[in-house]
């Protein structure tokens, strides 16, 4: 009996040579590390070394998160991934009325260079790669990181890492935007230019499908809308006067990995192929690195359950395997208790151990792209590619990603798919172990990690002390220069860095830009 994939595509019970009738491996596959990069962006992939194990972490104060990072490094993690709290993500200080009740809850609270210094205390920034999940205020957090590196005596040329910096998906699926799309894209172009000149090894953006998938996007929707956003960013940078080969090699992507292994592997392979062709054929990129879709993967939090949470260990292992078989460059495996609360030290360690088992106790790293030539995976790769290209065409017909966002196209498509998933789960047509089948009569108690509510008062006290100690005249002058740059065409990151060095807060810098650029107010898409 034919089944339907997450993207609504048929999965036949048996595949044979007829599934690939007329299929040209030279056109569709190529060699690993070669155009169109279907088989992976590097010739040897994991046969030389495994993917980067980058565990996402951050909660409470900078002191608490610093201790967690040091523990992760001691446990063998290869790169840090910083989670920020909602006030930081929205450009508000911890003592702002709107921040009440959210300080330190879903990530670490960072208000100034003082907090950033504590966050990375004892962690040599020339020895670790750091990813920061921050979007609308990404420029600020990058500059704070650079300032702390300078205090450590580390030159910007030695800094490696990534800022997410993908604001378009915030309008589609997540909501942590600050400025309207126009100024937001201008700020992203300024970041591209700044990093090329000042922090050349930094990945300037992580164009993200993960959040769309968590909101309900199918695999085909996930890569279609993500790549459409990527096209918008490339056009923005080119329009700002940059050569495509000057910035495209530093672009990166971020996808989800679900338990549906076959379609997930197909999705990753299709995304690489589409992006390579877009960059070559539409933008005329010449540097092979400009054609490579390098991506980070996080296992699907939306598939984790609060019921029988230990079963999530199995889900995460399967999701991680799908990401590895699909050729991810780095991976975060969720902790089994994340459907309940922030992970404990033990659950975070188990999540990392899951990756280590995949890397060192299986044979998936022994050969490149193990599914190459598989009837089912090659057919599904073609099918996902076709479905994604059709959605990308619809975005283009609306005028590109920004215009499609204003029409509510992506959001509506994702919400329709999310509703379908909810209906199938409620009816038990879609089996979720422990939720609609194989339930327990009584759940075992589980004690989650709890964030101390006193953190909010602690952060407010730190801010009061900072404002009392700093040179307010220097702060005011720097913020005035920032407003002037934002009003004109100068790169805003240079005066922004001066303001942050003078100990202006994240909220003060964002408020200065709000005065010039305004704040985004969403329109009803329905």
PLM ranges: what are they?
Residues 141, 230, 253-279, 295-321, ...:
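Extended, hydrophobic alpha-helical segments in both membrane/secreted and soluble proteins
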Residues 101-105, 169-179, 212-217, 255-260, ...:
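Short beta-alpha connecting loops at secondary-structure transitions
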Residues 78, 121-125, 150-155, 189-201, ...:
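Generic secondary-structure signature for well-ordered alpha-helical cores
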Residues 3-22, 31-37, 86, 344-345, ...:
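Flexible, glycine-rich loop/tail regions that form catalytic "lids" or insertion modules at the edges
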Residues 1-258, 263, 282, 289-296, ...:
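Catalytic alpha/beta active-site cores
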Residues 111, 129, 134-137, 149-151, ...:
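Phosphate/diphosphate-binding loops
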Residues 54-56, 82-85, 131-135, 162-164, ...:
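Generic beta-strand/beta-sheet core signal
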Residues 243-247, 285-299, 307-336, 343-368, ...:
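Flexible glycine/proline-rich, aromatic-decorated loop/lid segments
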